[in-house]
């Protein structure tokens, strides 16, 4: 079954061609164009010819007065033609650079200059063949769907027919665009045209939309060259005269000069260099070093010679060979800086911290005795009793009074926190373990205990039996500033008590018979207190080196001596 079309009414209707040209122009510019086409594609001429297409009915699904659905086989070989106008880029290097990233191209200057020329293309000798699904309804118009690519061939005539390369390129590109047009855009165009012919509501709404568009577009256009800037320059930065500005217009040439104000250029340059970064949105934050400043010269300018309190620790950690002892050095330096009683300078605390770190490293491998025996070598029973209390003795030999030599404390100064200033003192401290040697000022609380005991003993020498009761009432409390209290106490006892208590204040050989009982009781109490405190520090979890200083931060007083 076949049909014969009356093609003459379509050829006679002028409004149909006008509307079809507008729809084709919008459809050709909607799809992404190749980079060689630098302007919009305009349909200047459209003619459907005098030869109608041939339709063969393959299937009819629905047939009524106001609706129809069927599948057809269409073939067309006629004299229809279509004329297009656009502008193309004649320099292929410019097109190549536009489609490649800037960091991957050599960025030529003269060779990449754009050259645009007008182009007129005429499409004729269409040959179409394909299967079409046609659905007709007076309420919804005509819907046409191509099940395959209907374009077989066409003829492309252009301005560059004399150049074979350009002719073949245009033929290939236009064929690709027309295949997309037939599959996607042409069914939409036919549907809109059918709605305009058979649906009055759609026609009225379209006319109202066109009227609103024309009203908005009325009035003279604004010329950006009417009010040029005060100091205009061209794209190369050359200043322009008033005569040159007056000669410029929007339609004077293909490429209009870009006018920029010199003040705006300076502002853009300052904005580009903002915060010494390439980001235009870098916030302005005071006293902040950006990553673009992290060069040796910029780092020196930013610091200004001021070192933070923790900078010596960083310098010390980087200046030695990495190992397990680095952690001991850092801990000793941090403890010496945080325990300083006055606001000393950073470099002085750094020097003292280095000395403390060397002592802790030298005594790291020598751990022999954990108990310092301060008793007199008089009887054996006393030694047995003290060694029974202590749990830190690590030797298997019989308890001896002289087994642990007394350390020669050579850093007897008024400042209880000051560590040794030179590495010579490490020869005099061989038996102090490293876990208790990290904070050297631990000897000062022991010296204060001995001083208090001597003073209490001197005041109550006639009543040696009531030592425990008096000691409970006179227990020294930990003050908020323990270092200042220790300093005043040491100055008060400077004339009465000797300075080197661990080795000289206790009379061992030339003591008088009248004070032998008092000295013996004092030594026993002092040794028991030291052993008990060291035992508590060993059993306390965490860092045992700083347990004594951690107890100073509590408000509770230490327990009474002898308990």
UniProtKB/Swiss-Prot annotation:
State where composition is biased (Basic residues): 358-370
InterPro entries recorded for this chain?
Answer: Mdm34, SMP_LBD
Any single GO CC term annotated in Swiss-Prot or TrEMBL for this entry: ERMES complex
Citing just one GO molecular function, the answer is: lipid binding
Membrane-spanning regions, if any?
Answer: none
Q: Does the keyword Cell inner membrane apply?
A: no
Its localization reads: Mitochondrion outer membrane
- Please give the biological process terms from Gene Ontology that the record holds: mitochondrial genome maintenance; mitochondrion-endoplasmic reticulum membrane tethering; phospholipid transport
Stretch list, region Disordered: 212-237, 336-399, 411-431, 488-517, 537-563
Q: Which keywords does this chain's UniProt record carry?
A: Lipid transport, Lipid-binding, Membrane, Mitochondrion, Mitochondrion outer membrane, Transmembrane, Transmembrane beta strand, Transport
Compositional bias (Basic and acidic residues): 371-381
Q: How does it sit in the membrane?
A: Multi-pass membrane protein
Give residue spans, biased composition: Polar residues.
336-351, 387-399
Q: How does it assemble?
A: Component of the ER-mitochondria encounter structure (ERMES) or MDM complex, composed of mmm1, mdm10, mdm12 and mdm34.
Q: Which family does it belong to?
A: Belongs to the MDM34 family.
- Tell me the function of this protein: Component of the ERMES/MDM complex, which serves as a molecular tether to connect the endoplasmic reticulum (ER) and mitochondria. Components of this complex are involved in the control of mitochondrial shape and protein biogenesis, and function in nonvesicular lipid trafficking between the ER and mitochondria. Mdm34 is required for the interaction of the ER-resident membrane protein mmm1 and the outer mitochondrial membrane-resident beta-barrel protein mdm10.
Q: What is known of its domains?
A: Lacks alpha-helical transmembrane segments, suggesting that it resides in the membrane via beta-sheet conformations similar to those predicted for other outer membrane proteins and porin. The SMP-LTD domain is a barrel-like domain that can bind various types of glycerophospholipids in its interior and mediate their transfer between two adjacent bilayers.
Q: What is this protein called?
A: Mitochondrial distribution and morphology protein 34
In the UniProt record, what gene is named as encoding this protein?
A: mdm34
């Amino acid at each position: 079954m076949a049909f014969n079309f009356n093609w003459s009414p379509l050829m006679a209707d002028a409004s149909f061609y006008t509307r079809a040209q507008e729809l084709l122009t919008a459809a050709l510019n909607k799809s992404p164009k190749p980079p060689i086409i630098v302007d919009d594609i305009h349909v200047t001429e459209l003619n459907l010819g005098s030869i109608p297409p041939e339709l063969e009915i393959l299937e009819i699904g629905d047939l009524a007065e106001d609706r129809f659905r069927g599948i057809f086989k269409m073939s067309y070989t006629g004299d229809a033609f279509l004329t297009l106008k656009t502008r193309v880029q004649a320099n292929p290097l410019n097109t190549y650079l536009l489609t490649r990233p800037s960091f991957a191209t050599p960025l030529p200057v003269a060779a990449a200059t754009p050259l645009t020329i007008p182009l007129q293309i005429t499409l004729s000798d269409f040959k179409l063949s394909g299967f079409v699904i046609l659905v007709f309804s007076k309420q919804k118009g005509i819907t046409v769907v191509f099940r395959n690519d209907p374009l077989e061939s066409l003829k492309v005539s252009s301005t560059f027919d004399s150049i074979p390369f350009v002719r073949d390129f245009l033929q290939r590109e236009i064929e690709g665009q027309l295949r997309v047009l037939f599959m996607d855009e042409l069914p939409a165009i036919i549907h809109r045209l059918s709605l305009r012919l058979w649906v009055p509501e759609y026609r009225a709404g379209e006319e109202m939309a066109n009227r609103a568009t024309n009203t908005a577009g009325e009035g003279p256009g604004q010329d950006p060259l009417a009010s040029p800037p005060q100091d205009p320059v061209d794209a190369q930065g050359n200043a322009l005269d008033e005569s040159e500005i007056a000669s410029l217009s929007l339609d004077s040439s293909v490429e209009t000069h870009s006018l920029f104000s010199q003040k705006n250029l300076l502002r853009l340059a300052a904005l580009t260099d903002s915060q010494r970064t390439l980001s235009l949105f870098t916030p302005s934050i005071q006293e902040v070093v950006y990553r673009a400043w992290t060069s040796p010269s910029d780092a020196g300018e930013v610091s200004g010679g001021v070192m933070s309190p923790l900078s010596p620790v960083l310098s010390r950690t980087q200046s030695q060979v990495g190992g397990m002892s680095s952690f001991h050095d850092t801990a000793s330096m941090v403890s010496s800086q945080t325990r300083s009683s006055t606001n000393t300078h950073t470099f002085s605390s750094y020097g003292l911290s280095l000395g403390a770190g060397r002592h802790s490293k030298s005594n790291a491998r020598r751990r022999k005795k954990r108990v310092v025996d301060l008793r007199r070598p008089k009887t054996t029973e006393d030694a047995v009793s003290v060694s029974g209390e202590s749990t830190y003795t690590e030797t298997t030999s019989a308890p001896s009074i002289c087994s642990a030599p007394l350390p020669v404390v050579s850093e007897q100064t008024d400042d209880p926190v000051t560590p040794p200033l030179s590495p010579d003192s490490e020869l005099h401290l061989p038996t102090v373990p490293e876990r208790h040697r990290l904070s050297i000022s631990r000897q000062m609380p022991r010296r204060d205990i001995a001083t208090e005991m001597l003073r209490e003993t001197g005041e109550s020498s006639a009543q040696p039996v009531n030592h425990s009761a008096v000691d409970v009432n006179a227990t020294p409390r930990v003050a908020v500033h323990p270092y200042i209290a220790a300093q005043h106490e040491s100055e008060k006892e400077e004339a009465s008590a000797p300075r080197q208590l661990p080795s000289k204040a206790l009379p061992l050989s030339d003591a008088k018979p009248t004070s032998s009982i008092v000295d013996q009781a004092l030594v026993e109490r002092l040794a028991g207190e030291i052993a008990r405190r060291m035992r508590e520090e060993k059993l306390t979890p965490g860092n045992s080196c700083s347990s004594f200083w951690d107890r100073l931060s509590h408000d509770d007083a230490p327990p009474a001596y002898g308990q």
